[in-house]
């Protein structure tokens, strides 16, 4: 029986943090045994906001190293860079011509990013969801792991695929969302009301996968809690709940077992143990990261691109012919 194909993309716009790992990458690693996976470094998406070319290039390779260190296996999955497959922007143009302005103007993420960077709003940022649709549809993807903030974009992708198939003939699979039950939203340590982010300015906001042990201890020690002093899984107590969620996801212990473990302990003891759990969980990733050479990264990317290009080419040629393009 043929495995279903999963497509996932990640931007090379900064250091990978614990939220990226628990919310997406750890899930991707677990998917490898069950599905055929394509993991794409979506560097073309990264230029929709200002970014230094040298930084973008170095971060692209650093991200590949970290994904490999986390457990993405080139023997099980295709790992490649978006800009090395020319059909991504080519198909995006075909899809651009099928989507109304009204549908695009309803995209909430464009509005949010425009407010944060009003001087840097460009057409690429507006068209971001169409390029994302192209990324997914090129590979006849069955499933797409998405967080809450990407659900609207996947819905647009589904609508675009259905409309194209209806207007021109069957071309695209209509992908389904694959949503992790837990871990999809890890919040900031210093502000548990916002999702952990690479771009947040707070020095103690995020734990990065390459943070030294003493840095991790310091960040967790300063993490927001409350004045109640009771360690329990209560979503209304955002700070404590966020830290407990991290502990649960890394330790694989049940909420009941964790609450029992810390029943008569204070936040100081809990944070100390949480820091140790985080440090021990990241240790093998950090060790593997140091072992990966630049040559290994390039070999993995070449192999991934060779796997991706024929799939993308076949879909693009079919879409092009159905639209009457020579």
From Swiss-Prot:
The protein's annotated catalytic reaction(s) are: tRNA(Trp) + L-tryptophan + ATP = L-tryptophyl-tRNA(Trp) + AMP + diphosphate + H(+)
Question: What top-level class of enzyme does the UniProt entry assign?
Answer: ligase
Location of motif 'HIGH' region in this chain is: 12-20
Q: Does the keyword Protein biosynthesis apply?
A: yes
Annotated residues for binding of ATP:
11-13, 19-20, 147-149, 186, 195-199
Q: Which Gene3D superfamilies match?
A: HUPs, Tyrosyl-Transfer RNA Synthetase
Molecular function via GO: ATP binding; tryptophan-tRNA ligase activity
Q: Which PROSITE patterns match?
A: AA_TRNA_LIGASE_I
Among the entry's GO cellular component annotations, what is one?
cytosol
Q: Which GO terms describe its biological process?
A: tryptophanyl-tRNA aminoacylation
The signal peptide stretch is: none
Pinpoint motif 'KMSKS' region by residue range.
Answer: 195-199
Q: Where does L-tryptophan bind?
A: 135
Pfam families per record: tRNA-synt_1b
Keywords of the record, alphabetical order, are: Aminoacyl-tRNA synthetase, ATP-binding, Cytoplasm, Ligase, Nucleotide-binding, Protein biosynthesis
The record's principal subcellular location, in a coarse class, is cytoplasm
Quote the subunit structure annotation.
Homodimer.
Q: What function does the entry list?
A: Catalyzes the attachment of tryptophan to tRNA(Trp).
Question: What name appears for this protein in its UniProt entry?
Answer: Tryptophan--tRNA ligase
Can you name the source organism? Helicobacter pylori (strain J99 / ATCC 700824)
